[in-house]
Structures are given as C-alpha cells and as structure tokens.
Amino acid sequence: MPELPEVETTRRGIAPHLEGQKVSRVIVRDRRLRWPIPEDLDVRLSGQRIVLVERRAKYLLINAEVGTLISHLGMSGNLRLVEVGLPAAKHEHVDIELESGLALRYTDPRRFGAMLWSHDPLNHELLVRLGPEPLTDLFDGERLYQLSRGRSMAVKPFIMDNAVVVGVGNIYATEALFAAGIDPRREAKGISRARYLKLAIEIKRILAAAIERGGTTLRDFIGGDGQPGYFQQELFVYGRGGENCKVCGTGLREIKLGQRASVYCPRCQS
C-alpha cells in the first residue's frame, strides 16, 4: 500500500504538470472504486483550471477553481502522466485530460482507492478527524507521550493511529521503532517521555529520507513520473523477518501486531 512518502512523491511528480493547466475533459472507464466515482465528475471538473495539488495524510487534493478532487491510491493505485490519447490498459480507470496534451491517468487493479469531489475537503468526513502531519511542528514526542498515557495497546499500532499522527504506515512504523530501539510489542503507556522524544525524531527523519529517495518500491508503487522509489534499499527490518540484523547480527523476528506483519530485532529493541 502506498504510504505517506509514496503519496508525497506522486504529488511532487504530478503537481508541476497540473498546476495552472485547464482540464479539457475527464474520461471515467470504471466508477467502481472503494466509493463510486461521482457520475458528474466530468461536468464538475472540465473547463476548470487546476490551482494547487496538495497532500493531506495519504490523500491527494487536486484543487480546481471551484471544488477539489480528493484522491486516495488505496492498496495498489497510482497516478501518472501520459499523453492524451494513449490507449488505456486494463485497470486504468480514469484520465483527466489537460489542454497541454497530457493526461493524469489513474490506475487501480484492486479498486480500493477513491476519487471524490468536495467543496470543503479539509472538513470532508474522510479528513476532518485526522491527526497532525508528521513533518510539521504540530507533531513531536511530547504529543506521543501525552496521548499514550493510559493506552495499553502496543506501541506500533498506537503510532499508526491516524488520530495520533497521520502517515506512519507499516513500513515506516517498523523502521522508526527499530531506529529508536523500541520493541513494537511494548505497551504504549509504558514508554518513557525520553523514548517518545527519540521515536518522534526517528519518524521524522525516516519519512523525510524516504520522500527524498522517492518512496519505497513494494510491488505496485511507482511515482507520478513513472519511476520507482529507492528507499527499499535502506530498510533495516521491514520485510526481513528471519534474516540477520544489519546492526548486531541477531536473527530478526517476525510477528503479527494488529493484523499486520511486524519485524524487530530482539537485541536492539527493548
């Protein structure tokens, strides 16, 4: 599933080609996503100029002169730029054609993504309850410490809770906990303020590094320019269950936490 760095990589790839451009038409080949694509999307968006492309958590906000297209890539979706008229392959559900001769093409084999329309996107039901962005000053270790008091859940699903902080998905939660030396199974309430301060620093560092390297390529993800991400080359623990720790050589253990695979080093993390 594309996580925050992959979505931000997509935003950076498509924004320069969309902002300031006028939409000539919208072609919808299949409306059946997680929520149906609005039947009047072509009418709403065609003829409008795209003003700004933003990201909130893992949602892309394509702001037109009137209204905003909210897009989520789901489990396996991607947005990329193609030439207008390029024949569509299977699973290529939407083309947003621009007067520049380019089209923004949405592909989603599993159809778990979304394309919705809103006149007030930040107050849309999908976005209004989201926590702070991890790379802003609104998120820090003190927030983690305060929100964790009384929480008996494991620390990994705690930091993956979008009400606590957005965008810390399975890959980056696994890596950040390793970098901070915290066992993912530990109760959130049992972790000290000092360790949460360290964890927040590592979350910010790892997400920023992943964005710089274009995200992590796992199966389906490619950036908005059609290129893969390269952060996978720097993963210390994610996806390496049974292999040896790159730091101490101990065998990495893989467990299930909150229905997700989690890998950790029993020596480096406590």
UniProtKB/Swiss-Prot annotation:
**ZnF endpoints (FPG-type):** 236-270
Q: Which InterPro entries match?
A: DNA_glyclase/AP_lyase_DNA-bd, DNA_glyclase_Znf_dom_DNA_BS, Formamido-pyr_DNA_Glyclase, FPG_cat, MutM-like_N-ter, Ribosomal_uS13-like_H2TH, Znf_DNA_glyclase/AP_lyase, Znf_FPG/IleRS
**Which keywords are on file for this protein?**
DNA damage, DNA repair, DNA-binding, Glycosidase, Hydrolase, Lyase, Metal-binding, Multifunctional enzyme, Zinc, Zinc-finger
Q: How is the cofactor bound?
A: Binds 1 zinc ion per subunit.
Q: Which reaction does it catalyse?
A: Hydrolysis of DNA containing ring-opened 7-methylguanine residues, releasing 2,6-diamino-4-hydroxy-5-(N-methyl)formamidopyrimidine; 2'-deoxyribonucleotide-(2'-deoxyribose 5'-phosphate)-2'-deoxyribonucleotide-DNA = a 3'-end 2'-deoxyribonucleotide-(2,3-dehydro-2,3-deoxyribose 5'-phosphate)-DNA + a 5'-end 5'-phospho-2'-deoxyribonucleoside-DNA + H(+)
Catalytic site: 2 (schiff-base intermediate with dna), 3 (proton donor), 58 (proton donor), 260 (proton donor)
Instruction: Tell me its cofactors.
Output: Zn(2+)
A single Gene Ontology MF term assigned here is:
8-oxo-7,8-dihydroguanine DNA N-glycosylase activity
Q: Is Lyase among the key words of this record?
A: yes
What SMART domains does the annotation carry?
Fapy_DNA_glyco, H2TH
- Binding sites annotated in the UniProt record for DNA: 91, 110, 151
CDD domains documented for this protein? EcFpg-like_N (cd08966)
Subunit organization: Monomer.
Q: Which family does it belong to?
A: Belongs to the FPG family.
UniProt protein name: Formamidopyrimidine-DNA glycosylase
Q: Which organism is it from?
A: Pseudomonas fluorescens (strain ATCC BAA-477 / NRRL B-23932 / Pf-5)
Primary gene name: mutM
